[in-house]
Amino acid sequence: MPFLRKRGEYMRRIIVDMQNLLFADAIARTLRSADSDFDVRRSESPDKTAELCSLCQPYALLMEVTGYTPWKLEERLKIRDEAKEQSPHCKIVLIVDENAEKELARRVLQAKKDGLIDNFIYGSVSAAYLLAVIDTL
């Protein structure tokens, strides 16, 4: 179940797997905001993300995509496959810097069009928009 019961309310588990630790902390803080119902956990490293998904059964998995191993799109899609195998209802959201990685951003967009991911977010969006996207998955 992708929900955790906490203090009489249901909390949606979110796993964040990002290369940029400052960005990851900012996303986690945004998702934990006073009005949200998210239980946010950070993956220690990409090689532990699928295992964490198996243990936590998350509502959503947010992963940063870059041009560098182990954050390349192909590697992220492998993690997606492993996560979906253990948690079929888990929503997959990729985050990409559309200014620094234009071609990669185009490929992430195509992955969404092809149905490989549930959504994507550009790194330049506001915290409020990020929260709204995750809330409406």
What are these regions (language model features)?
Residues 61, 92, 119-120:
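Two-component signal transduction core modules
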Residues 27-31, 78-82, 104-113:
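Short, aromatic/basic amphipathic alpha-helical patches
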Residues 96-136:
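Output/docking surface of receiver
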Residues 44-60, 70:
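Acidic, metal-coordinating helix/loop segments flanking the phosphotransfer/catalytic sites
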Residues 21-43:
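Two-component/phosphorelay signaling modules centered on CheY-like receiver
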Residues 1-15, 19-28, 125-137:
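Non-catalytic signal-transmission and effector/linker regions of two-component phosphorelay proteins
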Residues 54-56, 82-89:
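Conserved phosphotransfer cores of two-component systems
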Residues 61-86, 96-99, 107:
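Conserved phosphotransfer microenvironments
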